[in-house]
A protein has these predicted regions:
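Feature captures the catalytic ectodomains and active-site-proximal regions of enzymes
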Residues: 1-260
Length: 260
């Protein structure tokens, strides 16, 4: 955004919290839930964050402290005749990042299965329950590739995340950077220019000029179970990661049930 990299989850830049400098409502201008004001049951620590303002603004925010509270918050919303209730739980994502998709992950999925069952029990007749996810998870572990030093010397900055990096080349380095990225990483990743991605409609048919300006010039997307990191700023060490366009990451469940 401008000449700074925004961490949208924390709503921070290199200068710190950026809520005042980067207005969440301007950054993400589409009204959530088609402008309808509904209850949003989500972790209490996310209340009033920049990211929450961007995607859940104008909701009745019902912050929960523990997963055991979620069902009761939803029940309270339904008792108030809410036509639609949104609820978010981040346990599977956290466990996947920390432990990968092994026994810990399976245990968390079992917990979520129980939670969904409890939610279904308190639904009034004539209510639909829809369960989905925002992404999958890939076990990367120690399969980390540090970006080549010669590449880093030809860029202004990197944005994105470890499985979907955007390179912002310094002036005059676009062609050589594109060629070398393809040569070095084409065996385990997709390399695409911004123009290719926009022409192929990766982000939909209509992209605002403001959104286009946030993109880098060249994208590097992991195809294999690897992560690409800047060794000067590697970020947290994670076992499970997501962000690329493999089937494991983009195909998510959609489970629906109607309470008669």
């Amino acid at each position: 955004v401008g000449n700074q990299i925004l961490n949208s989850l924390r709503w921070t830049t290199g200068s710190g919290v950026a809520v005042n400098e980067i207005n969440p409502s301007s950054f993400q201008p589409i009204p959530p839930f088609l402008g309808e004001k509904i209850p949003a049951v989500s972790p209490v620590e996310f209340r009033n964050s920049g990211f929450t303002e961007a995607h859940l603004r104008n909701t009745y925010y019902e912050g929960y402290f523990l997963s055991s509270n979620i069902t009761h918050h939803i029940a309270q919303c339904l008792d108030q005749d809410s036509r639609l209730v949104y609820a978010y739980y981040d346990g599977i994502d956290k466990v996947g990042h920390i432990h990968g998709t092994g026994h810990f992950y399976d245990a968390e999925i079992a917990l979520v299965d129980y939670l969904i069952g409890q939610i279904y029990k308190i639904l009034p007749s004539g209510t639909a329950l829809i369960v989905t996810s925002d992404h999958g998870m890939v076990d990367v572990g120690d399969s980390v590739i540090e970006i080549n030093d010669s590449l880093m010397q030809r860029i202004n900055t990197i944005s994105g995340e470890a499985r979907f990096l955007w390179f912002h080349p310094a002036r005059g380095n676009h062609e050589s950077l594109l060629r070398d990225l393809q040569d070095l990483y084409g065996n385990c990743a997709w390399v695409r220019t911004k123009d290719q991605i926009l022409d192929e409609g990766w982000f939909g048919r209509q992209i605002s000029d403001q959104a286009k300006e946030r993109l880098g010039e060249i994208a590097l997307l992991a195809r294999d179970p690897v992560a690409f990191l800047d060794k000067e700023n590697p970020g947290p060490k994670l076992v499970g990661r997501h962000g690329s366009l493999t089937e494991t990451e983009v195909y998510v469940p959609l489970i629906t049930s109607f309470k008669e």
